[in-house]
C-alpha cells in the first residue's frame, strides 16, 4: 500500500520536504486568495489549520516565498491545473 501525506508519496522516513510543503502552501494561498477571493485573515487561519503551523509562521513563509507567489500569480493557474498537480486536495 502506498502511503501519502499532503498529496505526496512518502518514503520510509514518513516525511515530506519543506520545499514540497511550501510549494503546496503557496498553491493553496493562491487558490484561496485569488480564485476563491477569501479575506486575508481567513486564508491565514485556514492555512495555519491545514498545515499545523502558527498563523505568524504562515505569514513569515508567505513573505519569504513572495517571489514564488508572484510567479504563480503571473502564470494564473486554473483550478484544473492545480487539481492535476495535487488531485488529493479540494480545488472547488
Show which residues each predicted segment covers.
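Basic, amphipathic alpha-helix used for nucleic-acid engagement in HTH/winged-helix/SANT-Myb modules
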Residues: 1-24, 86-90
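Short alpha-helical elements
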Residues: 5, 60-64, 92
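Short, amphipathic alpha-helical "recognition" segments used to contact nucleic acids or chromatin
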Residues: 18-42
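Short alpha-helical "recognition helix" segments of helix-turn-helix
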Residues: 43-52
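Major-groove recognition helix of helix-turn-helix-like DNA-binding domains
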Residues: 53-77
Amino acid at each position: 500500500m502506498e502511503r501519502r501525506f499532503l498529496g505526496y508519496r512518502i518514503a520510509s522516513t514518513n516525511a515530506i520536504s519543506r520545499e514540497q510543503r511550501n510549494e503546496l502552501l503557496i498553491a493553496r494561498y493562491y487558490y484561496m486568495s485569488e480564485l476563491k477571493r477569501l479575506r486575508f485573515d481567513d486564508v491565514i487561519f485556514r492555512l495555519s489549520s491545514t498545515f499545523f503551523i502558527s498563523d505568524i509562521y504562515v505569514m513569515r513563509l508567505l513573505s519569504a516565498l513572495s517571489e514564488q507567489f508572484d510567479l504563480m500569480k503571473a502564470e494564473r493557474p486554473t483550478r484544473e491545473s492545480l487539481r492535476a498537480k495535487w488531485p488529493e486536495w479540494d480545488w472547488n
